């Protein structure tokens, strides 16, 4: 079963948590869900060059807090913070309410599955050979501390007449193990020959405690540790 389902959905409530975190009263659920879809669609279009990994939406006390996880926060912020303020105003106007926009830097984009898939898609659109793009991304992930990596590309690879699927694996990716911290991301490369689909699984180790927020806490701790080591070196 672990081979078939989305690894993030399978681990929700075990060591992963939801990207939309709010409670809807009677008759409000559909409205809030459509707002979430519009917010994500708008941000992904506007920030397509900012390497956005995921967008978390929370709604405390009838407000809306949007947290964008990005590898390039400078692109989102803009000159003197002008771009992020414009985005915040547009989001507030779109949902007709107050919006707080926060940024979280992805410190290791090489082991973020969504960003790896996006990187491969961009390379394929630039006509880089698909095998080279897949191998390069896999080597970068393993070098940055991933325990295992699996990349699948499907479509008219190399401009072939007949579509096929190519797969590369390195290390272990235990999809059945619920305590395994597995990141999963997909992307589409729109090439002249047609669309090529990319799927990426990255195994980062095991999370032994039963904690839905464990993955986010580990990311935060690694960022703080890196900042401390930088200060000590200085």
Curated annotation (Swiss-Prot):
Q: Quaternary structure?
A: Part of the 30S ribosomal subunit. Forms a tight complex with proteins S10 and S14.
Q: What function is annotated for this protein?
A: Binds the lower part of the 30S subunit head. Binds mRNA in the 70S ribosome, positioning it for translation.
Q: Which GO terms describe its biological process?
A: translation
Where, by residue number, does the polypeptide cross the bilayer?
none
Q: Gene Ontology cellular component?
A: cytosolic small ribosomal subunit
Task: Identify the keywords attached in UniProt to this record, alphabetized.
Answer: Ribonucleoprotein, Ribosomal protein, RNA-binding, rRNA-binding
Please indicate which superkingdom the organism of origin belongs to: Bacteria
Tell me the protein's name: Small ribosomal subunit protein uS3
- The encoding gene is rpsC
SUPFAM superfamilies hit by this protein: Prokaryotic type KH domain (KH-domain type II), Ribosomal protein S3 C-terminal domain
Where does the record place Basic and acidic residues bias? 215-227
- Region: Disordered, residue numbers: 215-234
What is any Pfam family matched here? KH_2
Q: Which family does it belong to?
A: Belongs to the universal ribosomal protein uS3 family.
InterPro entries recorded: KH_dom, KH_dom-like_a/b, KH_dom_type_2, KH_sf_prok-type, Ribosomal_S3_C_sf, Ribosomal_uS3_bac-typ, Ribosomal_uS3_C, Ribosomal_uS3_CS
Domain KH type-2 span(s) in chain numbering:
39-107
Enumerate the CDD domains for this protein: KH-II_30S_S3
User: In the record, what lineage is assigned to the organism producing the protein?
Assistant: Bacteria, Pseudomonadati, Pseudomonadota, Alphaproteobacteria, Maricaulales
Molecular functions per Gene Ontology: mRNA binding; rRNA binding; structural constituent of ribosome
């Amino acid at each position: 079963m672990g081979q078939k389902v989305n690894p993030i959905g399978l681990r929700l409530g075990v060591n992963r948590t939801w990207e939309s975190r709010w409670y809807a009263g009677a008759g409000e659920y559909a409205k809030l869900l459509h707002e979430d879809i519009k917010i994500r669609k708008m941000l992904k279009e506007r920030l397509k060059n900012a390497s956005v990994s995921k967008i978390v939406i929370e709604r405390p006390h009838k407000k809306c807090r949007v947290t964008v996880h990005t590898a390039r926060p400078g692109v989102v912020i803009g000159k003197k913070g002008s771009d992020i303020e414009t985005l915040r105003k547009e989001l507030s106007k779109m949902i007709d309410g107050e919006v707080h926009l926060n940024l979280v830097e992805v410190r290791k984009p090489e082991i973020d599955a969504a960003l790896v898939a996006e990187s491969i898609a961009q390379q394929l659109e630039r006509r880089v050979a698909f095998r080279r793009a897949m191998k390069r991304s896999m080597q970068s992930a393993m070098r940055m501390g991933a325990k295992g990596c699996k990349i699948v590309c499907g479509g008219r690879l190399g401009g072939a007449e007949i579509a096929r699927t190519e797969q590369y694996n390195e290390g272990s990716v235990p999809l059945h193990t619920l305590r395994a911290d597995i990141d999963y991301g997909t992307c589409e490369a729109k090439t002249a020959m047609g669309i090529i689909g990319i799927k990426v699984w990255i195994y980062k180790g095991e999370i032994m405690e039963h904690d839905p927020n464990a993955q986010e806490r580990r990311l935060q701790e690694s960022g703080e540790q890196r900042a401390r080591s930088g200060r000590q070196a200085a």
